[in-house]
Structure formats: structure tokens, C-alpha cells
Amino acid sequence: MSNELDYRPVMLLQNDINLKYSSPNDDEAWSKYLENPMTAATKAMMRANGDDDGVAALSLLYDYYRVPKEKRIITQGSTGRCDQVKRSCIEYDSDISTYDSTQLMRFLNDNNSSTHEYSETHKKNSYLSLDCLINPSKLPLSSGKLDNNAHDDFMATSCDVYEKNPLTTLFDPIHVPPPQQRWQPDSTFKEDTPEPLIFNDILRSQAESTCSEDYIPGEANRDFECTLESPKAIHIKSGESPMAYLNKGQFYPVNLRTAETRKCVHLTSNKVKSVVMVVFDNEKNPEEQLKRWKHWHSRQPTAKQRVIDVADYKENCNTVENIEEVAYNALSFVWNINEEAKIFIGINCLSTDFSSQKGVKGVPLNLQIDTYDFETGVKRLIHRAVCQIKIFCDKGAERKMRDEERKQFRRKGKSADQNNKDIKASVLPGYRGSDFTYLRPVTDMETHPVLFIPNIHYSNLQRCGVVLQSAADNSDRLSLKRSSQSFPESFEAPPSKQQTNEDPQRVLLYVRRETEEVFDALMLKTPDLKGLRNAISEKYELPEERICRVYKKCKRGILVNMDNNIIQHYSNHVAFLLDLTDVDGKIQVTLKEL
């Protein structure tokens, strides 16, 4: 039966759109099928092949054409054919209400609960609908050539009366209870549907701020926005600050700007001073924090290894000024609130560096940015923002992000299958989450951060052509720091590092005269010019007051005056040729570098 129906669709001739139909009506075409009604065996075979809709549709057509034609179609009048059909359906409504509707309700329930996923057999049956006769564009493309002559007499006449599918129009007035999904469609025959993005909750434009009302504490200052150009972690516990994954030693941009909806902040000028620091959670004991920093510092290859570094990029010089290394884990700079500031920072520690045990989970750190009124130094804190960071090595941040994306994909895929089985969840290829991590403003403006300054003397570096002051000379910053000397020495460095952490005030020089072959050691009690004079006086039994000039001659022949800075940083464990010259009763000392 179904094979015969497959040959009933209309074949449209492309050249003659006004071609008349050869068959007078559908009653004659269906009369021979009424003589052989569908049997239970035929229905069972069709249902076994998954063609429940076909069984219901054929049963409905059999019942429909058993009704006399006079009750189905009104005699043609002045109105159009489409209006006649609509009126005939209204008149026929009373007959439908009294009709035995077992097959009818079965068809409606199955039809309404379907998810528009059909097999190829269903698609063929759908082409029997009169909608395809009215709209030729809905017909499927044929793989073979059409022979117009062979099919001139093979035309259906259903659209001679109806404008659209009569089954839909006929049963519009019938009220059917809400359908329920009763069968699982075969996934093999699923049609392509628009695939939703599983990360649509985090796909946002850069201009949109992710700091929503429920994300920021109510009393937090929102005058400034601080962002870290690094992908934000997907899985974050509720109530925690956002987290970013970073690679050790890689530089990341940090952007600071004034929020568009900022309130009036009474600043003394348009400049503010921001301090970027890597700290532990401020709720932790300061002694415990310093103990961890000491443990990390003792395992570094050099005593001058810093926790946070700043890169000498052009973007830094154009947007910020007065970059200072406040501590080993902090740096400060000045920027204009009317312009967006950008600075590139790199972190030189791993999250697993703070424990001597292997296999211990890494300790998350906080990237904290404190902003002060520039004219008041660090006396007036006006904004504080924090985000969590985890530092990995060897591109570990990218691997961690990919792992989280796969977990998110599986979680979203399972939930999508449970809630809506006709939609396939997907993930954007190469998508790495949000490209920015917004630092969360906090309300705690009283807690002082623990900044790490080892027991060695270091000088601030010169950045962007600006000579920076020493950290000890800036009294405004003393309230910001917490030196390790303020706490008891509860940590001892390993023996391999104790020599590095010895008293840095001592400088050792190796000197000899040109006539000598063996060097003498000059131990300077103080790393300055006075200490050098005192050591030479004691070693060679010369009156210290007679030593007037001390020069250093470099390997390239440059003669420079020896000063405290050269002695402190460029003379320790260096070998020199000592030349003592008597000039007008005074002794002139020249150290030739070897």
C-alpha cells in the first residue's frame, strides 16, 4: 500500500505553469483503495518499520473519504475555493464531534508530540500533502531526469479544492490536551538544527563589564576597573574572586581605567598611584605568609630573584610613570585617571613552590591592586581589587584551560540531552573562555598587605628614563610594608643557601701590586668609600687621612671615580691591580680591573 502511495506526488512541468490537471477528483482515485481497507497486519508491519505517523495518516484518509462528498465540499458559489473549504470544515465539525475518534485522537497526539525528526519514509509521505502542490519549492530535488510525456496523465487534483493541507484545516476546531512525548525518535534520522553554544553565559563583549550587581559587594568602590588580559577560569566556587591561570615568567597586560559610572571621588589631582602586588589571602596569618615567602626565596638560584617583574614595553612608558619596585612581590606606578593605563607584569613563582612536599596541591595567590590618591602618597586608599591566580610552568595554563573546557563540554552536553533530546550541544573550536579576567573590588580597605623584603640591600631599577628613589628613603611607603624583620625568625634557610643570605654589608676585594704574584684580600667592614680607605690603610699601614683619591680603571681603559654605588654593587669578589701614587704628599689609589 505504501509503495503505491509513493507514486502519487505531483510532478510539476517547468515550462507550462497553466497545465490543467487530468484527474477530475480524488474520490475516483481513492475508490479502489476503499475496496481493500488496511488490515491489522499491514498496520503492524508499518509500525515495526517506525512508520506510526504513516499508519495514522492513512487511517485518517480512509475515514475521510468514506464520508459522502456532499458533506465535505459545498457547491461552488461566488466565493473562492479556499473559503468554501473553510466553511465546509466548520459545517463538518458537528460530524467530527460524534465520530468514533480513536484513530483520530491517536493521530493528533502522535503528530503534535513529534519533534519534526522524520525518516526518509516520513519525508516521502509528507510530500503527499497538498502544501507541496501549492508550493513547488517544497518538493524534493529529483536525482533523475523527468519525462514530461510519460507523466502527462499522472497529476493529482487535490489542490483544485484546497489551499493548504486539509488535515490541518479540518481539525483546527478540535481541542486536544497537551501532548506528551511517547517515543524516542531514532537519532539516525535527526535533521540538522541550530546548535546552541554551551558557553553562551560567558560570551560577552569586552565593553561589557562582568562586575554585575550581585558580583560586587554592595559597599565596594566601583570607581575603577582593573583587568588582567588572561583567560578566566571556568569553574569558580560561589562567592570567590575570579581566577586566572598564568604561566611562570610570561608577561601579561594589566589594564586600569576609570569606570564610566563612577561616582565623584574627591581627588587632589587627576593622578593616582596604584600598587600591583602578589600576595596570599589577607585573612591568613602574616607570620605564615612571610614564612612561605622565605621558603620560596631560599630555593631561588639568586638572592635577587623577584616574585613580580615589570616589562619595559612601550605601552608602559606611554600610559604610566614612576614605576618603582616597592618590594619583591609588589611594584607601584602613577597614571592619569582620564586615560587607560596598561602595564605588563610577569610572575616568577609557581603555586607549588611554597611547600617542600611533592604532590601537594598548589596554593592559589591573589593579584591585588591598591590605588591611592597620588598627592597623599599611600595615606589614602581609594580602591582595592583582587583576583585569584594560579601559576603553572611550560604552558600549563593553556592545558588547564583545555581540561576545564572539556569538562564544561561534557557537563553541558549531558544537561542538554536530559532537557532537550533533539538539540545537540556543541563548543566553539579553539574557544578559550573570556579573554579578560576582571579583578573584583572588595570592601576591606583596612588590612595591610604583607609585602616581602628579604634581609638584603637592593636598589630600585631605572624604568623609562626615570631615576627611582630608594625604598628606604620614601617614608610614605613605610606604612604599606611589613618587613620580615618585624617577625621572629622561625625559618632557617637550607645550608646551600646560607652563604647567599649572609650579611650583605660586607664586600671582599682581591688586590695585588704589579710586582706581586699573590693577591691580598681586602675585607670592607662597610660597603662604601670610607670602608675601602680603612681597609687599604690597615693592610698597607698607611695613614687613612693621606688617602685622597680612589680611582677605578675598567678593562676598556676608562678611569672613573670610585664611589659608594660602585663598591656596593660592582666590586664584591673582583680582582684588581693596586697602584699607590704619591701626589703632593697625598696618596692616590688606582684599582685596575683584571
UniProtKB/Swiss-Prot annotation:
InterPro entries: CP2, TF_CP2-like. GO terms for biological process: regulation of transcription by RNA polymerase II. Residues 483-503 are annotated as: Disordered. The keyword Metal-binding does not apply. Keywords: DNA-binding, Nucleus, Transcription, Transcription regulation. Residues 220-453 form the Grh/CP2 DB domain. Its main location: nucleus. The keyword Protein biosynthesis does not apply. GO terms for molecular function: DNA binding; DNA-binding transcription factor activity. Transcription factor playing important roles in primary neurulation and in the differentiation of stratified epithelia of both ectodermal and endodermal origin. Binds directly to the consensus DNA sequence 5'-AACCGGTT-3' acting as an activator and repressor on distinct target genes. GRHL genes (GRHL1, GRHL2 and GRHL3) show a paradoxal lack of redundancy despite their extensive sequence identity in the DNA-binding and protein dimerization domains and the fact that the core consensus DNA binding sites are identical. They have related but remarkably different functions during embryogenesis because of their differential spatiotemporal expression patterns during development. Belongs to the grh/CP2 family. Grainyhead subfamily. This is Grainyhead-like protein 3 homolog. It comes from Xenopus tropicalis.
